[in-house]
Amino acid sequence: MLLSDRDIRAEIAAGRLGVEPLLENLIQPSSIDVRLDRMFRVFDNSRYTHIDPAQRQDELTSLVEPGEGEPFVLHPGEFVLGSTLEVCTLPDDLAGRLEGKSSLGRLGLLTHSTAGFIDPGFSGHITLELSNVANLPITLWPGMKIGQLCLFRLSSPAEHPYGSAAAGSKYQGQRGPTPSRSYLNFPLPSDAVDAVESR
């Protein structure tokens, strides 16, 4: 069930749902508008010959922060990571879905490529996967509305919500645009397993 504005306000007032800092005018009929933080992760194409999800590639991206009062310019075909200004905390019986803003989509800005789902129990800044599919650069202003968070009530609370030991939560408590930790989804090579077991 998708939560209405009344439900969203009730969850916030009860202290079960956290969106900080929250302005009242960000609550929409069935979502909460989220704003863009000021940090971005840009890809450095000179560090690696290719992207390998199975490998830890710490130098694949670097953190960029525009000067005070300045936008970040996203060029045509460019892909960067951003994050929400708000820290979002979901209880164990609510899941979230991040959607783009219609006005920005009409300009060619994609807010996320595939990862718009937020698990129950998640807490942290939401990382945005920003793409420019337009033919001109797009200026991204820190603090601008960048997306909308829809909230869904589960049929029952999650047995192992995000952040619990059983969930394997790689991004719990993330601050700012957080690079991929996909390598943690791959089994360790046998020599690495031997090294860990010998400790």
UniProtKB/Swiss-Prot annotation:
Keywords: Hydrolase, Nucleotide metabolism, Nucleotide-binding
Subunit structure: Homotrimer.
HAMAP family the record matches: dCTP_deaminase
Binding site for dCTP: K101, S102, S103, L104, G105, R106, D119, T127, L128, E129, Q148, Y162, Q174
Record lineage: Bacteria, Bacillati, Actinomycetota, Actinomycetes, Mycobacteriales
Organism: Nocardia farcinica (strain IFM 10152)
Site feature (Important for bifunctional activity) residues: G116, F117
Active-site residues per Swiss-Prot or TrEMBL entry: E129 (proton donor/acceptor)
Any single GO BP term: nucleobase-containing small molecule interconversion
Protein name: dCTP deaminase, dUMP-forming
Xref: NCBIfam families: dCTP_deam
Membership in a protein family: Belongs to the dCTP deaminase family.
Pfam families found in the cross-reference section: DCD
Enzyme class name: hydrolase
Pathway membership: Pyrimidine metabolism; dUMP biosynthesis; dUMP from dCTP: step 1/1
Keyword Nucleotidyltransferase attached: no
Molecular-function annotations in GO: dCTP deaminase (dUMP-forming) activity; dCTP deaminase activity; nucleotide binding
Composition skew (Polar residues), residue ranges: 171-183
